């Protein structure tokens, strides 16, 4: 029971961290698209491409989980999402809409891991606690809605001084959140 509780805790942490990161990123993505693109018709494209990335991430998750395990697939998919955040960060540095789109696609992989983590928590739980584990996972995702935009607003001036773009903070929070999510899956779910 202790091992299952530890695994569920790790999965819940991964949901919380990745939600904070992902919500921080999508908070600034439309504004970032406006910053790097001159055409207002393109503003919604990065978030739409991110949904496609979530689809591709789910496919990647499925293939890796068949070959290794669900938990290894989750950890790797979160890590790929963190790489997407790095690409998004760089897209603002070099002022590239194409890189913004590629980064949004790759970050979508991390979002797919967030969604998969919710269900993985219920798979790990015993029959008696499956519903509780799933409910807690959904509640942990609420942290992203609350703290993601808050972190962006608190640190935007600091990163504006460093990188000449206050929007970069959303991608830094996303990278850290996805890396912490990957680490929490690795740390708490290995026996």
Summary of predicted features, one role per range:
Residues 1-53:
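Helix-loop boundary and gating motifs at the non-cytosolic
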Residues 57-70, 156:
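Helix-to-loop junctions at the C-terminal end of transmembrane segments
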Residues 148, 152-153, 157, 175-191:
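C-terminal membrane-cytosol helix-exit motif in multi-pass small-molecule transporters
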Residues 16, 97-114:
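Hydrophobic core of transmembrane alpha-helices in multi-pass small-molecule transporters
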Residues 53, 132-152:
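Glycine-rich segments within core transmembrane alpha-helices of 12-TM secondary carriers
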Residues 29-31, 111-126:
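Intracellular juxtamembrane helix-capping segments at the cytosolic ends
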Residues 79-94:
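C-terminal ends and interior cores of transmembrane alpha-helices
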